[in-house]
Curated annotation (Swiss-Prot):
A Pfam family that the UniProt record links to this protein: RbsD_FucU
Iron listed as a keyword: no
Protein name in UniProt: D-ribose pyranase
GO biological process terms on file: D-ribose catabolic process
EC number of the protein: 5.4.99.62
Organism: Clostridium botulinum (strain Alaska E43 / Type E3)
First-level EC class: isomerase
Gene name as annotated: rbsD
Amino acid sequence: MRKTALLNSNLSSVISKMGHTDMIAIGDCGLPIPDESERIDLALIKGIPTFMQTLKTILLELQIEEIILAKETKDVSPNLYEEIKEVIGDVKITFITHEELKTTLKSCKAVVRTGEQTPYANIILKSGVVF
């Protein structure tokens, strides 16, 4: 049996295949996922799993160099924004509009759907390198 934190085989596979600057997104349960991206649907019921649980788990497995957030997140969901900043540390944050974020999802290796219902609980993680 796998010993590391991440048990979901589809998510583990995507992360294992990611190279420098590849992107993966985590979204709330309402985020539209484009056909161009692999859908990894973790949503069970409202709120399970949460956006933050999913983000923290992925960060155990994936080195990131940048995150992309919708500009609206800071104003509409300030508590979530502060939690994200706390978890990512000194990682670069790029802000784009929510509409631009939805378009950028087409370039992501996968979009992970959570049970989160907080508005604008969506993020794109850009893979870094461990050296």
